[in-house]
């Protein structure tokens, strides 16, 4: 079973995410990762690893107060850093983690490929981030998430 932790607060998000996701280690997992918004670059700072979250070393000092972390049991794709979560959308503006299986992810992935999307991972999660990006071209965030 996956573990997911989100953080919004006044303290350093990276350290909070890393310490809190460790509390879910008892569930077991094969890879892990975390992501925060780097206000200095206005982009995501992501670190991933195979195995425990403790294997993530040399975290950059990022003065961020928001982020997500994830521990993964592989259901789609091999166990590697590329398939570890968080997954980014093609334009790198959406970072997502998820627990579950998108049953029709292959159909959705094919639809997105036909619309010019390229994929880095073998995960169904990357399909979600790109599908949201696709719908944001036409709709607001609320409507895009509904679709």
Please identify what each model-predicted range represents.
Residues 1-147:
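Conserved short alpha-helical segments that host acidic/polar catalytic motifs at enzyme active sites
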């Amino acid at each position: 079973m996956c573990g997911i932790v989100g953080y919004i607060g006044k303290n350093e998000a990276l350290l909070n995410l890393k310490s809190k996701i460790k509390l879910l280690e008892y569930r077991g997992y094969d890879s892990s990762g975390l992501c925060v918004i780097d206000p200095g670059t206005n982009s995501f700072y992501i670190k991933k690893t195979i195995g425990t979250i403790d294997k993530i070393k040399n975290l950059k000092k990022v003065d961020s107060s928001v982020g997500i972390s994830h521990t993964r049991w592989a259901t789609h794709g091999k166990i590697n850093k590329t398939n570890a979560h968080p997954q980014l959308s093609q334009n790198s503006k959406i970072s997502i983690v998820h627990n579950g299986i998108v049953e029709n992810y292959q159909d959705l992935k094919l639809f997105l490929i036909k619309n010019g999307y390229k994929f880095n991972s073998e995960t169904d999660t990357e399909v979600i981030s790109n599908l949201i990006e696709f719908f944001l071209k036409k709709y607001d965030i609320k409507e895009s998430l509904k679709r």
